[in-house]
A protein has these predicted regions:
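Histidine- and aromatic-rich segments of cupredoxin/plastocyanin-like copper-binding domains
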Residues: 1-154
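C-terminal substrate/ligand-recognition segments
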Residues: 152-158, 162-215
């Protein structure tokens, strides 16, 4: 067996854990639930959708996105199959609402499914979480049409701000930024105190990567 140590594409386990539990199921009442979702995977990006079937995607099932890492959205966003799922990258967070009261009594199970993501090595769809629908209860809660107040931000950057572009590429198994490998002795950007700069990150590496800056 030959292992190519220059061909790494992250670590993909064959079982997805939710809150540390494999093959998780959750008993729910037939009402609205608000969930906070964090992608804690080291390498995997998800596209989440609700389905009435464990193996195939059913049509017309939905979830409503109400918040992101930055807090409440201005308005809720409803995602229904098969048109759209919730794409969630590594370390991203979302808050969603699923209305289990919308399903008739003969529907006993729902599944939170990963539709697969092209950049993942194993992009096959799979069920992540099973909801067991139980008793129907009164629920007068509503999802407001207006959520958080989002104040538009004006132009804070002066016209003479310095612009930098950082291109992330992978050639021959080696990661490069602007065609340079990492060197702890080299400084690629050294803004002065009070300077304004606009940085553009371009990912051409072939898959999603959570690029972030260390100061």
């Amino acid at each position: 067996m030959i292992f190519d140590d220059r061909g790494q594409r992250g670590v993909y386990g064959d079982v997805v854990l939710i809150n540390g539990v494999p093959y998780l199921y959750l008993e729910v009442e037939r009402r609205k639930y608000r969930f906070r979702v964090l992608n804690g995977s080291a390498s995997r990006t998800y596209e989440l959708a609700v389905s009435q079937d464990e193996k195939t995607l059913t049509i017309g099932d939905g979830l409503t996105v109400i918040a992101t890492d930055a807090g409440l959205l201005a308005t809720p966003v409803e995602l229904k199959t098969p048109a759209a799922g919730l794409q969630i990258g590594i370390a991203e967070r979302y808050e969603i609402v699923i209305d289990f009261a919308a399903y008739p009594d003969h529907v006993e199970h729902l599944y939170l499914r990963n539709l697969g993501f092209p950049s993942n090595l194993d992009s096959e769809p799979q069920a992540l979480l099973r909801f067991d629908l139980k008793r129907r209860v009164p629920d007068d809660s509503i999802i407001p049409t207006q959520l958080g107040k989002v104040t538009p931000i004006g132009n804070l950057i002066p016209s003479n701000a310095k612009r930098r572009t950082f291109r992330f590429e992978r050639t021959g198994g080696e990661w490069k930024i602007n065609n340079k490998t990492w060197d702890p002795q080299r400084i690629d950007a050294n803004p002065g105190l009070g300077d304004y700069e606009i940085w553009t990150f371009v990912n051409t590496g072939g898959w999603v990567h959570p690029v972030h800056v260390h100061l």
